[in-house]
């Protein structure tokens, strides 16, 4: 009897102290907004690209978050493009000259520090691995409630060249992808 009670107490304590919550891949995603530049940028297209966040955890009390995105699942959404053009953009994006998602199939983030920044908000610093290169990044995170689940929202910018990616350029550089990308993350826990 005492042994059973001790087991139940230790199990309850371990559950109470376990704060790491898994990310829900069905509801968590990254959306990348790609803009254009160049003399004839009016002839180019803006792109919206998205992928689910494949796995990860959030530990709010410890100020820790880590997640992985399968770069091969990044998909061009662009509703203004026909299917053929969307497939072309998708192929270029995954090619060795841009993401090289065959060689670098994972995009990873691992936090190193989180500082409270108001009610349900934090400034989070961590390491982002993209295109085989890891660099420190700092982001502002806001928490929202969604259908009884916690959703952590991030909007940030990064430069492709910081991660060894050369922005796509056509027509002698008169139409090109901007180096700076806008990234929106929605990290929803289970």
What is the meaning of each model-derived region?
Residues 4-16:
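Bacterial N-terminal signal peptides
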């Amino acid at each position: 009897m005492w042994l059973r009670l001790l087991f139940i107490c230790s199990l309850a304590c371990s559950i109470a102290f376990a704060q790491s919550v898994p990310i829900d891949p069905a509801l968590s995603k990254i959306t990348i907004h790609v803009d254009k530049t160049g003399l004839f940028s009016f002839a180019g297209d803006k792109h919206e690209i998205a992928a689910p966040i494949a796995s990860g955890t959030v530990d709010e009390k410890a100020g820790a978050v880590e997640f992985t995105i399968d770069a091969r699942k990044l998909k061009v959404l662009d509703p203004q493009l026909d299917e053929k053009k969307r497939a072309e953009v998708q192929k270029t994006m995954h090619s060795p000259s841009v993401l090289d998602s065959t060689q670098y199939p994972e995009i990873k983030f691992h936090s190193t520090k989180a500082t409270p920044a108001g009610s349900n908000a934090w400034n989070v610093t961590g390491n982002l691995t993209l295109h085989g290169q890891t660099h420190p990044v700092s982001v502002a995170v806001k928490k929202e409630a969604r259908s009884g689940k916690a959703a952590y929202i991030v909007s940030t910018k990064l430069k492709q060249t910081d991660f060894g990616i050369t922005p796509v350029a056509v027509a002698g550089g008169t139409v090109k992808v901007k180096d700076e990308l806008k990234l929106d993350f929605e990290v929803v826990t289970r």
